[in-house]
UniProtKB/Swiss-Prot annotation:
EC number: 5.4.99.25
Function, as annotated: Responsible for synthesis of pseudouridine from uracil-55 in the psi GC loop of transfer RNAs.
Protein name: tRNA pseudouridine synthase B
GO terms for biological process, alphabetical: mRNA pseudouridine synthesis; tRNA pseudouridine synthesis
Catalysed transformations (reactions): uridine(55) in tRNA = pseudouridine(55) in tRNA
Cited InterPro entries: PsdUridine_synth_cat_dom_sf, PsdUridine_synth_N, tRNA_psdUridine_synth_TruB, TruB_C
Organism name: Bdellovibrio bacteriovorus (strain ATCC 15356 / DSM 50701 / NCIMB 9529 / HD100)
Length: 308
């Protein structure tokens, strides 16, 4: 494949720590010679791990990829509180950790499972009255910090030291690991800050499917995107699919749902479990559209994909 602009789909990138998510996107734009690159979820500069990046027509999949749950390996430093809830921030307080034991740390960590409504970090991009929270923090302006329902589960200890611990954890989209660590520090009575974070899972993708930017660049120079590339038709394995051909396909390309396609949708769509259905070509298998069901409107085209 010689034209890099022909690539459509996802790139699973193993982001290094020390650079921003925007830096990753900018690097991919240079590698792929296209502006049409985005991502499906920000990772803080100090964090590493899986970023699902979207290329060309793949950028239209952003909202569907964003909805997935996430998995992380975190490292918590006990005995410290900072303004950013991680060790890059300004230290607000230090406390002794002599009372900590492995059993106590693990016991309190496992209590922090399930749904909870908690304040979001002040250093976050959540907007209040049209302004990002971190802008209030940097300007030392008062603001009421909103609360958000977050969900954490599958908490597994990796290693626990005298004043630190590593855990594997899963969470709902939009949940903050920094907040979970802060809650753990409060439960232990000594405070805690995030000192390391690696995203290992962004449903339905895992970190072992990803490649570094250097590996991706080498693959592209060799004429492909390598194993980290996920084509459009495989990008949403969790979404039910149906296939069409002939006039149904022609009409869909013009933004119309044919009678036969509507009949297929009625048979396939289960409103109790399905949010969307993806429509693929019978021949060739390319992803043609994503269709949803809206009350009072019936089946609606959410996305139609065009390939040059």
């Amino acid at each position: 494949m010689t034209n890099k602009n022909q690539f459509n789909g996802l790139l699973l990138v193993d982001k290094p720590s020390g650079i921003s998510s925007h830096d990753v996107v900018a690097r991919l734009r240079r590698i792929l010679s296209t502006r049409a690159v985005g991502h499906s979820g920000t990772l803080d500069p100090m964090a590493s791990g899986l970023m699902a990046c979207l290329v060309n027509e793949g950028t239209k999949l952003s909202q569907y990829i964003l909805e997935g749950d996430k998995g992380y390996r975190l490292r918590a430093q006990f005995g410290i509180r900072t303004d950013t809830l991680d060790t890059t921030g300004e230290t607000l307080e230090t406390r002794p950790t002599d009372h900590l034991t492995r059993e106590l740390i693990l016991s309190e960590a496992l209590k922090l499972q399930g749904e909870m409504e908690v304040e979001v970090p002040i250093y976050s991009a959540i907007k209040v009255q049209g302004k990002k929270l971190y802008e209030y923090a940097r300007g030392e302006q008062e603001v009421t910090i909103p609360k958000k329902v977050m969900k954490f589960w599958d908490i597994e200890p990796v290693e626990i030291g005298s004043d630190w611990a590593e855990f594997d954890i899963k969470c709902s989209k939009g949940s903050y690991i920094r907040t979970w660590i802060d809650l753990l520090g409060k439960a232990l009575g000594c405070g805690a800050a995030m000192s390391g974070l690696r995203r290992t899972w962004s449903s339905p993708y895992k970190i072992d499917q990803a490649q570094t930017l250097e590996q991706i660049e080498a693959s592209v120079k060799g004429g492909s995107l390598g194993p980290a590339f996920v084509p459009m038709e495989l990008a949403l394995p969790q979404v039910k699919r149906i296939r069409i051909k002939g006039q149904d396909k022609v009409l869909l390309g013009n933004g119309q749902i044919s009678h036969d396609l509507r009949s297929q949708l009625i048979s396939a769509f289960n409103p109790d479990v399905d949010q969307y259905i993806q429509v693929l070509a019978q021949e060739g298998g390319e992803l043609l559209a994503v269709i949803g069901l809206e009350p009072g409107r019936g089946f609606v085209l959410r996305r139609v994909f065009k390939y040059s």
